[in-house]
Design a protein with these regions (language model features):
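N-terminal hydrophobic/helix-forming segments and targeting peptides
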Residues: 1-434
């Protein structure tokens, strides 16, 4: 007969009643670590080849088609095991595998975002000043402006000519490519700059990208440096300056993903937020076999700027996709949505001892603690968040524990310190358990 609580030692009581934080490394075998490291090699390849939302969708479509997915046809009636994808304007994508029970008991959704903080070009970006050519930018998402100066930048995106011709651009990623940069003041002249608060030392209007310093070979030419850049772009891409008006050009760090540390235990790269979730969400559905309920992975755009716009999850494209799945089976879409569940897959902050003042240690997530769960995000008094119901949190706990998943729970830093949002609220607003 089990001993009553009063008869147990303090150690036994502690093991039975308390929830101490443990280092998950010692719960994982060397074999599993080796598998995780192998998985991360694929992740690093994804980070290097898909630095923008358009490139991420191209990657997802190619991978999906290799795994038997086909473009979704809302007029077609699908059977269990069928695999489909919906490409939303080349900037967001929904993938689904039909379950044995179809949609009648709801669908199971994993949602992540594939846009990143970056520097977008202004509509009229090209100019010259003091014998140098530059591009004017408008930053996208939450950035620390000082981090974008004096680093190598690569140019990604599309230029759409007035006749509708789409020209893809990617410069700065391949060996031998030129790269670009935003200049900073050299330390010898930086005394005044150093006295400014970090948030005001660089402004958005300062983030102009240096792209050249040679003129066309004509001493009488007007705008000779700007003209030389357009000459080069015209020779390579057949575009003129006016075509930049209808372009989506993004400048991103040109760094490649690398291992961090002597033990290679971490990955350093641009775009972890949210590719560290988007890649596993994609891999999960690509390798899903015979689901009971229909499963859906959503890789969405515009999260970094509030999820508005027709490729963000505050629009209707995901709801329309699930509605089409439901109606094809004779189900009422709103009933399917209300029975559905979603994991909003986004990043949280691991405790950093060098910046301990912004964390509340007891409610932080830690390196080697496992997958991070956040019941809510938002800011201050939980503003702008979906606060997951306790019943759903319990279901997630049970699911992970039953599958042997190493996990932890925490908040995104101290209350009133800052905060962050994600797509969870837009899923929950459609009555999806999130």
């Amino acid at each position: 007969m089990a001993k009553k609580a009063a008869e147990k030692s303090a150690k036994e009581l502690s093991e039975m009643l308390l929830n101490p934080r443990k280092n998950g490394f010692f719960k994982v075998t060397d074999e599993k670590i080796e598998k995780a490291d192998k998985f991360c090699e694929g992740y690093k390849a994804f980070l290097n080849s898909a630095k923008t939302e358009r490139e991420s969708v191209e990657y997802a479509v190619a991978a999906a088609e290799k795994h038997g997915f086909v473009p979704f046809d809302p007029k077609h009636k699908y059977a269990a095991g069928d695999k489909v994808y919906y490409n939303n304007r080349g900037k967001a994508i929904c993938l689904a595998i039909m379950g044995k029970e179809g949609c009648k008991n709801g669908v199971r959704i994993a949602a992540a975002h594939i846009d990143n903080p970056r520097l977008d070009l202004k509509p009229i970006p090209l100019y010259e000043s003091t014998e140098m050519a530059y591009l004017k930018t408008h930053y996208y998402g939450g950035i620390k402006k000082y981090q974008w100066t004096a680093i190598p930048l690569a140019m990604h995106g599309v230029v759409v000519k007035s006749d509708g011709t789409v020209i893809k651009v990617c410069i700065g990623e391949e060996a031998g490519d030129p790269q670009f940069t935003i200049t900073d003041i050299l330390p010898h002249l930086g005394q005044d700059q150093a006295t400014k608060p970090l948030g005001t030392a660089f402004t958005g209007e300062d983030l102009n990208i240096l792209i050249g310093s040679r003129p066309v070979r004509d001493e009488e030419a007007k705008d000779a440096y700007k003209l030389n850049i357009m000459r080069l772009l015209n020779e390579k891409y057949g575009i003129v300056e006016a075509d930049l008006i209808s372009a989506e050009i993004e400048f991103v760090p040109a760094f490649k993903a690398v291992d961090i540390g002597f033990d290679r235990s971490l990955v350093g790269a641009y775009g972890h937020d949210d590719r560290v979730c988007a890649y596993p969400a994609l891999e999960a559905i690509l390798n899903c076999k015979n689901p009971v309920q229909t499963v859906v992975t959503v890789l969405t755009d515009k999260e970094e700027t509030g999820s508005d716009g027709n490729t963000g999850l505050n629009s209707e494209y995901m709801r329309y996709f699930i509605a089409d799945l439901a109606q094809a089976e004779g189900e009422e879409p709103r009933h399917v949505l209300s029975k559905s569940t979603c994991i909003s897959a986004d990043v949280t902050a691991a405790y950093d001892p060098h910046y301990a003042s912004v964390y509340e240690a007891q409610n932080s997530t830690y390196i080697n603690g496992g997958l991070g769960i956040a019941k809510y995000t938002g800011a201050r008094g939980k503003g702008g968040t979906s606060d997951a119901n306790a019943e759903f949190v319990a279901k997630i706990r049970r699911t992970f524990d039953d599958a042997g998943v190493l996990w932890q729970i925490g908040e995104l830093g101290k209350v009133d310190q800052g905060g962050g949002g994600t797509v969870a609220c837009y899923m929950a607003n459609r009555n999806i358990e999130t």
